[in-house]
Curated annotation (Swiss-Prot):
Heterodimer of an alpha subunit and a beta subunit. PSII is composed of 1 copy each of membrane proteins PsbA, PsbB, PsbC, PsbD, PsbE, PsbF, PsbH, PsbI, PsbJ, PsbK, PsbL, PsbM, PsbT, PsbX, PsbY, PsbZ, Psb30/Ycf12, at least 3 peripheral proteins of the oxygen-evolving complex and a large number of cofactors. It forms dimeric complexes. It is found in: Plastid, Chloroplast thylakoid membrane. NCBIfam families: cyt_b559_beta. GO terms for biological process: photosynthetic electron transport chain. This is Cytochrome b559 subunit beta. Disulfide bonds: none annotated. It comes from Nephroselmis olivacea (Green alga). Heme binds at residue 20. Pfam families: Cytochrom_B559. Its cofactor is heme b. The gene is psbF. The chain crosses the membrane at residues 16-32.
Length: 41
């Protein structure tokens, strides 16, 4: 279990970081755009 965790840990961390690095700014971008449109109206 220890060897498996050490082998899988970095791969999952990189993938988790990549997914969140793309998903978080996208949600923030969409939210800010919709907020700006609501405020301007």
């Amino acid at each position: 279990m220890t060897t498996n965790t050490q082998y899988i840990y970095p791969i999952f961390t990189v993938r988790w970081l990549a997914v969140h690095a793309l998903a978080v700014p996208t949600v923030f971008f969409l939210g800010s755009i919709s907020a700006m449109q609501f405020i301007q109206r």
